[in-house]
C-alpha cells in the first residue's frame, strides 16, 4: 500500500527566496516532516475559494489543520481583545469549510493549536481570547518566540488516551484557549490549571484537536495514529458528494492506494 495523502493547511504570506519577494504558501517544515516520519505523504493546501473544497477533500486521505494566528472573534460573536491578532479572513473561511467537509465525509483529521480553535468555532464554540486575563499569568506562552513544555492529563477512555496514555509532556505556545466547547466535541485533556488541551469529535472515525504542537516534539504517536486512520479510511467519494451527509467512498480510490 502506498503512503496516504495527508493535506496540511497553509497560509499566504509575503516571502523571499533567491531574488524574488512574492506572496507564497507558507507552512513550517515541521508539519511535513512529522507526516513523512509517520508514514504519510504531505501536501500543503493553500486557502482557496469554497468551490474547491469538495475536490480537495475528495483527494486527500486525512487532514491536518495547522497552527497560526488568532482567528476572527466575530466568528464566535465577540469583539476583538486588544491582544488578539489581526485576522486572516481568507484562511479562517477556508479552514472552517475544510473541517466541516472533513466531518461530513468522516475523513480523519488532526487540528493543531489554532486548528483546534477552528474546529471548536466551526462547531459553535467560543474562545478565551487572552488566557492571562483568566489565569493571571502567561504560563502557556511565557516566551513570545519559543515553545514551552508543560504537562497534560489525558482521559484514558478517549482515542487520544489510547495513543498517549494518561499523561504527557507537550510543546506549546498559545495565549488563547477553548472557552465554551462546541457541539459534539468532548474535552479529553487538560493542564493542571484546567485549560482544555484536547478535544475529540464524538462519533467520528478520527477527529482530534490538540492545543499543543506535536509536530515540534519528538513524540510521533499522534501523527502515526492519524496516518494509521488514513490508511484504513474508505476511499474518498466523488467531489460532488462530499458536501452532503456522510457518504460511501468509492472503491476505485481505495484500489489506487493498494
Language-model features and meaning:
Residues 1-110, 120-121, 128, 132-163, ...:
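N-terminal beta1-alpha1 cap of cysteine-dependent amidohydrolase-like domains
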Residues 113:
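Conserved G/P- and acidic residue-centered "switch" motifs that form tight phosphate/ATP-binding loops
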Residues 116-118:
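Hydrophobic, aromatic-enriched interface-forming segments
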Residues 207-212:
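Active-site-proximal beta-strand elements of phosphoester/diester hydrolases
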Amino acid at each position: 500500500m502506498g503512503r496516504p495523502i495527508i493535506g496540511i493547511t497553509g497560509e499566504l504570506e509575503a516571502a523571499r527566496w533567491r531574488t524574488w519577494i512574492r506572496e507564497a504558501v507558507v507552512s513550517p517544515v515541521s508539519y511535513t516532516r512529522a507526516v513523512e516520519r509517520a508514514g504519510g505523504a504531505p501536501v500543503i493546501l493553500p486557502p482557496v475559494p469554497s468551490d474547491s473544497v469538495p475536490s480537495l477533500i475528495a483527494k486527500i486521505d486525512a487532514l491536518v489543520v495547522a497552527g497560526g494566528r488568532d482567528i476572527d472573534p466575530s466568528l464566535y460573536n465577540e469583539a476583538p481583545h486588544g491582544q488578539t491578532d489581526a485576522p486572516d479572513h481568507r484562511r479562517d473561511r477556508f479552514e472552517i469549510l475544510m473541517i466541516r467537509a472533513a466531518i461530513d465525509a468522516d475523513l480523519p483529521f488532526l487540528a493543531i493549536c489554532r486548528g483546534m480553535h477552528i474546529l471548536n468555532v466551526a462547531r459553535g464554540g467560543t474562545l478565551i481570547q487572552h488566557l492571562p486575563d483568566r489565569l493571571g499569568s502567561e504560563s502557556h506562552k511565557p516566551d513570545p518566540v519559543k515553545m514551552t513544555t508543560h504537562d497534560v492529563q489525558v482521559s484514558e477512555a478517549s482515542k487520544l488516551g489510547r495513543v498517549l496514555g494518561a499523561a504527557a509532556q507537550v510543546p506549546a505556545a498559545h495565549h488563547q484557549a477553548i472557552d465554551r466547547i462546541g457541539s459534539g466535541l468532548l474535552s479529553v485533556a487538560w493542564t493542571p490549571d484546567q485549560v482544555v488541551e484536547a478535544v475529540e469529535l464524538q462519533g467520528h472515525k478520527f477527529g482530534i484537536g490538540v492545543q499543543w504542537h506535536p509536530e515540534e516534539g519528538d513524540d510521533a504517536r499522534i501523527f502515526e495514529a492519524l496516518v494509521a486512520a488514513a490508511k484504513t479510511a474508505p476511499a474518498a467519494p466523488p467531489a460532488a458528494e462530499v458536501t452532503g451527509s456522510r457518504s460511501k467512498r468509492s472503491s476505485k480510490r481505495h484500489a489506487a492506494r493498494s
